A protein has these predicted regions:
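Charged, often glycine-rich, active-site loop that binds/positions anionic groups
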Residues: 71-72
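Beta-rich carbohydrate-recognition and catalytic domains
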Residues: 1-10, 19-67, 76-186, 190-196
Length: 196
């Protein structure tokens, strides 16, 4: 909830939801300043009653220096809750050096452990990873093109190597002939057998 009178938030956006061990997790970007500035933080709240009520906000990553960490997606797999969050640096311009970072929930402490940068090159995750028939996972998102001298922010996917969630290969999806490149390509994928 955007409540500058109580939590100081000037901006919240990008809810990611996941069920994990009977609890509902919600992540979102939170900023007391403007969107896409270094004060952006990744926050999480947890519900034990299916979303009727929520626990207090927990900071997954507040960044440091010019690093802002924002919204992303979850994956509950093999007993572990992963989070893949969009992040950026913001000292030279609004935001650049965009990338995705991974986090794992420590069930004992209920804190999030950073696993570092997992997809570089402007990739921002927008959909939870889906497992493909070859055993690899595909995560849909977009590639912020400004840092690469390109117009537009085209749809993109990141593909894992099996269950290794610490290294993803990013592929930008080019626009069809005749379609302008000036798009905001938030994307999603549907996996049906060997078809994506």
């Amino acid at each position: 909830k955007h409540r500058p009178d109580s939590d100081g938030a000037n901006w919240t956006l990008g809810v990611g939801l996941a069920w994990h061990k009977g609890r509902l997790y919600a992540s979102y970007g939170f900023n007391k300043g403007a969107e896409n500035t270094p004060t952006e933080e990744a926050h999480v709240r947890v519900s034990d009653d299916g979303g009727n009520s929520w626990g207090p906000p927990v900071v997954m990553d507040a960044g440091e220096g010019d690093l802002g960490v924002s919204h992303g997606v979850f994956l509950s797999h093999a007993g572990t809750l992963w989070a893949f969050m969009g992040a950026f640096h913001a000292h030279e311009k609004l935001y650049h050096r965009v990338h995705a970072r991974a986090y794992v929930l420590d069930e004992g402490s209920k804190k999030w452990a950073s696993r570092g940068v997992i997809a570089d090159g402007g990739f921002w995750p927008m959909q939870e990873p889906q497992q493909m028939s070859d055993g690899n996972w595909i995560m849909a998102g977009l590639r912020i093109g400004g840092g690469f001298g390109e117009a537009g922010n085209l749809p993109a996917v990141a593909i894992s190597k099996g269950d290794d969630f610490l290294s993803w290969e990013v592929t930008v999806i080019p626009p069809a002939a005749g379609v302008r490149r000036n798009v905001w390509g938030e994307s999603t994928v549907i996996v049906e057998g060997c078809r994506v």
